[in-house]
Amino acid sequence: MEVVEAAAQLQTLKFGGSGQGSAAPQPPEDRREAPPPGVQPPPPAPSGRPPPPPAPSSDPGGRPPPPPAPNWDAGGRPPPPPAPNSDPPPGGAWVTGRNAAEPPPVLQASDSSDSDSDSETDSDSSSSSSSSSSSSSSCVSFPPVLSDGDEDFQLEKENKNFPLKTKDELLLNELPSVEELTVILPEDIALKPLGKVSSIIEQLVIIESVTNIPPVNEDTVIFKSDRQAAGKIFEIFGPVAHPFYVLRFNSSDHIESKGIKINDTMYFAPSMKDFTQYIFTEKLKQDRGSDASWKNDQEPPPEVLDFSDDEKEKEAKQRKKSQIQGRKKLKSELNESGEDFGEVHENWNAYSSSEHSKGYHHREFSRGFARGRYSRRSHGRPPPQQYYNSDHMASQESLGFTPQRQDNPVMPHYPFPPPMFDMHNFPLPPPPPPPPPPPPSMGWAAPSMASHPVLNLPYSMPPPPLPPPPPPPPPSPGENNSSHFGPYF
């Protein structure tokens, strides 16, 4: 008996050691979830390995649970070792037997407590996450998404404080304040009804005129039935036969202080020229206007306005058309006259050049003076040679000769015979041959060029040839025969 008891104690110690070893943490791949409390696990398959028992959990005091009682058979022998095809669980051996498939009740309780604690932990974590998400969602606010209708309503609400206006338009609150009228008409001045108040819009009073009365113009003073002035006409709109008049006030309270209400009859004083100004329709027909809007919805400039009367407009267009045609005709005439002037100028130059070429070939003197015009042929020797000197410029001009230009220093002094001079008693050698022709830019001057109206023209534009002048009269016997050109050398 002692041997049996010793063997039982040894087996108990072995089982306790294996239980403590199994309490060690297992790898994650070998852990299996415990069944819920109150549910028995299914029995293992005959050919498969049995499921490993769950690790025992310690109680709150940190002590391990008591080991289960060993299962002995009826003969008092220990249980046989496990089958070869079954693997022992990691961490130690486990007891097999008839009741080995059922886990110990203590271990089931510990497993259920572990699962409960895990579920509670999961629930706590989920509740904490939900609470944190709810708190974070309450802290962060997103702008609401508006539909098209909501956006239009919001824009309309914002634009109420900013009315639409053109570039240079003045709003009512931007206009100067209305002056207060304290005019009371006496009883002897007649009043005539103008119309009734049809509507009151903020600080404006609209008066609809009655028929069969002449329309009145702006700044006409309007009176109430008690003969007190209500205000001046601010604007007129509508047809000429049935216009609407607008009275402007500083505010709606100003209108109430005047005692003006809808359907009140308003009057005007037709006999008071200082308070009443009429609109003359005939004058409007003469004025030009336009209903079309211009830049920034303003009135168009005067040059693009139209007449109110069709006949006046037709006359104005015809007058404008005739002016344009007159300007075109004058321009064409000026162009034609310019072309004619150019043609005459070209013919003039061509004729002058031909005459110059003839003078070079058939005349003896390069200056172009004819011998037979101013000199008489002597029956003796030829006239002596006389050279032109710059000191006798004035004497040449007095006789009608054009002096040589002094701005050309290259020009030589050409010989020419003195007019009206008889040289019978002065025998001189014959004259030298004629010099070469002058440059093309030099013109030919006629004897009467000093008195010709085209004297101021440049030398490149010579005048046309003129008829020869009459011969000069013969000198008197008592006249001094001294030369006008100085002594001979």
Curated annotation (Swiss-Prot):
Gene Ontology terms for molecular function: RNA binding
Renumbered residue ranges of the record's region Disordered: 1-150, 289-339, 421-489
Bias type Low complexity, positions: 124-138
Feature: compositional bias, Basic residues: 317-330
Gene Ontology biological-process annotations: box H/ACA snoRNP assembly; ribosome biogenesis; RNA stabilization; snoRNA guided rRNA pseudouridine synthesis
Biased composition, class Pro residues, residue ranges: 35-70, 77-91, 427-441, 460-477
Chain intervals with Acidic residues compositional bias: 113-123
Modified residues (N-acetylmethionine): M1
Keywords: Acetylation, Cytoplasm, Isopeptide bond, Nucleus, Phosphoprotein, Ribonucleoprotein, Ribosome biogenesis, RNA-binding, rRNA processing, Ubl conjugation
Family (UniProt): Belongs to the NAF1 family.
Protein name stated in the entry: H/ACA ribonucleoprotein complex non-core subunit NAF1
Native source species: Mus musculus (Mouse)
